[in-house]
């Protein structure tokens, strides 16, 4: 658990500057870009104390017209920006969070707004920020604050439930001239709770050099174009393989970090760098030519798994018993075959396929690929055929594709029980 919490995280940030920002900078886009690069450099500096690096991987400037309605109603603007990000921006450029920078003044004292504990979510990993000051640092700290909300942090307050050790830290409810670049004990706890509870996956991946769109800064711990390594400032760098002042490898070094970098040299070819997680995963080994561990690979579909009783599909070993356990708890088991005869009826929730409003019953050979039936605990004389159904998601409670339905056979995505060799 502690290792998971201590792992370095990378927020790959997309920033959108709206039309009002272009007007504010008199149409000088180069000047506007520089202003934003400075903001991101400060945000990265602020977050390094939490072992988070923030990299600008995309910058979009709406120089002709706004692509959403940016208004003084912060709540509405945030909602439409989140919606636009999910339906438009994400399809064009991969990133973890998107923030809008605007010169429109929000109602009341609001200078920014963001969804809380939403990092990595499609329509809510967003924030909006008002470019409210001539001082770059104050705008950067506003965006750092809103990004903090995305990462699960609430405001620093002192009340009966919460005693925060700082009144002027990044997550202070209001911005002041005394504002600091530090995070309070409350923010650190909130962030750790967010990691534990939500397990956001997207921020575990390091951006590649070519993903970062801001000019390289030696000493910011991000590996950028033109750098061989970046271990932070000369004062804080503790990596003997990297010259902190130049961001070049020290003499005789082949690498400075990576799963296949051992004491500044590439690990020997064949050295395991990522163990197989389970039957459907493959262990990866170093090539001897690179500091990076090869891409995580999976066993081929149809590879036997689960004591040779099941078959792999997309890196998972779908086992019917486990599907019952996930719905009904540890005492659940797959129901007897007789329960699956309900799927032959093709009525109510019992079928193999449903297209629009039409229900297709299962053929006899496919009955174990339709609705899943389970029993709870030991069975007596009477068996109740337990099943699960959801109005919102018709796939919930159905046997998962890839599940074994007979010897040498699996359910395909059409819910037919087919030979494992033809399924894949």
UniProtKB/Swiss-Prot annotation:
| EC number(s) per entry | 3.4.24.-
GO cellular component labels = extracellular region; plasma membrane
Query: What SUPFAM superfamilies would the database entry show?
Result: Blood coagulation inhibitor (disintegrin), Metalloproteases ('zincins'), catalytic domain
Q: Where in the cell is it found?
A: Secreted
Q: Which residues carry a glycan?
A: 69, 185
Which residues belong to any copy of the Disintegrin domain?
A: 215-301
Task: Please list the disulfide bridges.
Answer: 120-202, 164-186, 166-169, 218-247, 229-242, 231-237, 241-264, 255-261, 260-286, 273-293, 280-312, 305-317, 324-374, 339-385, 352-362, 369-411, 405-417
**InterPro entries, alphabetized:** ADAM_Cys-rich, Disintegrin_CS, Disintegrin_dom, Disintegrin_dom_sf, MetalloPept_cat_dom_sf, Peptidase_M12B, Reprolysin_adamalysin
Q: What else is known?
A: The disintegrin domain belongs to the long disintegrin subfamily. Negative results: does not show hemorrhagic activity.
Q: What is this protein called?
A: Zinc metalloproteinase-disintegrin-like brevilysin H2b
What organism is the protein native to? Gloydius brevicauda
